[in-house]
Amino acid sequence: MNVQIFILLLIISWLTPKITSLPPESQVLDRSSFPDDFVFGTAISAFQSEGATSEGGKSPTIWDYFSHTFPERTNMQNADVAVDFYHRYKDDIKLIEELNVDAFRFSISWARLIPSGKVKDGVNKEGVQFYKALIDELIANGIQPSVTLYHWDHPQALEDEYGGFLNPQIIEDFRNFARVCFENFGDKVKMWTTINEPYVISVAGYDTGIKAVGRCSKWVNSRCQAGDSAIEPYIVSHHLLLSHAAAVQEFRNCNKTLQDGKIGIVISPWWLEPYDSTSSADKEAVERGLPLELEWHLNPVIYGDYPETMKKHVGNRLPAFTPEQSKMLINSSDFIGVNYYSIHFTAHLPHIDHTRPRFRTDHHFEKKLINRSNHETGPGDDRGKIHSHPEGLRRVLNYIKDKYNNPIVYVKENGIDHYDDGTKSRETILKDTFRISYHQDHLKQVHKAIIEDGCDVRGYYVWSLFDNFEWEHGYNSRFGMYYVDFKNNLQRYPKDSVNWFKKFLSRPVVRSEETEDEKVCNVSRKEEKINKALDVSEGFKTSVDSIVNLIKNGSRIEEEDDEEERDFCAFKNHNDQLGFFLKLQNSLGF
């Protein structure tokens, strides 16, 4: 027994440096590190990818109008063709399948389904058929469709008729659009998103005017033809929230949707840190800013009202919900979708021009990419506009958990861009090691949020499947895992991140049967395996044959059954070695 103890201690002393030298968590995470039902996916949106803007009965959207009427505001580019997903979706689905993802998130073009925006004017059968074919093709390839109803592209006809989301009429039109979607696709789609990023729609479209519909106060942005940055962002968000609630009502009342189907809203928070970490004023600015990033659109869909800090700072410019509207909003999201990219530093604004109120200054702070110590929010330089700050995602997830009693959360977008002004070679852009690092680091934070913090996170979607039309940046901002050659027939090329994700998401091959030869595992083969495993240590002076013979002839060790022998013979790495020797320890009675 003393000899056996000595041998065991010798083995453990040899294994200890091997165990402590294992790679860090970010390098060893893979699909199996996450819960079994965790969903991995990728995403696109209709306007950014489909193209075929005048085909199949589709009418112009607000982005068609914006990019054609004000081309200087979209980098002199438009999405008339985009990446031609409308015609190439079958080939693109093969690319999705090769990634080993579980789900694919896409949006339905309201203008393709109901060209006038109003159901009374008719539903476009070609549009219905396109999305049915897309959904069927995804399912046939083992990919779950995840559908977004509104990704910023309502029909221009509604803008011309009554001002789009500035007018409450749009709530019923959106309700009807949603019902058409549920009736036609609800029997095959389990996961639905109502509104994608209401914050961006409201602020970029109506406070800064940099995105469609391009409205703002003239003194904010001289390119804006009309608008009021003091009130329109709040009005638009109000109607977006009520449109969300109306769609959820239709979803829950529709007998054609799957019983286990889920519907929710998707927000786009940037985590905030103080510009000056020693300044109490900047810390208080963060406390005012986070409710805008997170609570502005979550409080209503969970509690039925806006956060108190917004009521305090915006006053009567913030619309109020009626009791009936509040009731409709409460618990109207089965899950919370989070699109996360990075963080901002937040500085207190001590002086505000009260004669020129606007959303960006109502809460007395401004956002910055560099803090007082001249540190950026994360790695980025001239590579692109997104800086990597993965810890912010974990903080966002914990904020939601703590504030809203740990609801179900899906990370619906996470990604990083590569700026391309046309001078970079394809080969340069294909080597996107920064993107691999970005996703490794963010997945590590998601994993920590689940395992260490107890956040109920159920999925992670990469933005985006391929390079596409990136709104005001045109085609210069490349977020895709697949490179699209916009100069040569839109050919797709996998970036290095594609191969990384394939490996990360690969599943072990399960073999249903073993041959008789594979079941036979004799003593000599055991000795060979152990010899290979242990001989990697030059300092291991003890004869492996002696250890094996001692173990083999030990009075207290019984012959293992076939399954245990297969396990014994199969170990190939240090983790397997450790498992074997722990078995040995138990068998010796220690």
Curated annotation (Swiss-Prot):
The catalytic site is made up of E197 (proton donor), E413 (nucleophile)
Q: Which residues form the signal peptide?
A: 1-21
Q: Which reaction does it catalyse?
A: Hydrolysis of terminal, non-reducing beta-D-glucosyl residues with release of beta-D-glucose
Q: Does the keyword Hydrolase apply?
A: yes
Disulfide bond entries: C216-C224
Protein name as catalogued? Beta-glucosidase 29
Q: Which domain of life is it from?
A: Eukaryota
Q: Which PROSITE patterns match?
A: GLYCOSYL_HYDROL_F1_2
Q: Which gene encodes it?
A: BGLU29
Q: Which Gene3D superfamilies match?
A: Glycosidases
Residues bearing carbohydrate: N255, N331, N371, N522, N553
Q: Which UniProt keywords apply?
A: Disulfide bond, Glycoprotein, Glycosidase, Hydrolase, Signal
Claim: Metal-binding is one of the keywords in the record: no
| Family, similarity comment | Belongs to the glycosyl hydrolase 1 family.
Question: What is this enzyme's EC?
Answer: 3.2.1.21
Q: Which residues bind a beta-D-glucoside?
A: Q48, H151, N196, E197, Y341, E413, W463, E470, W471, F479
Name the Gene Ontology biological process terms: carbohydrate metabolic process
Q: Which Pfam families match?
A: Glyco_hydro_1
Q: Name one GO molecular function term.
A: beta-glucosidase activity
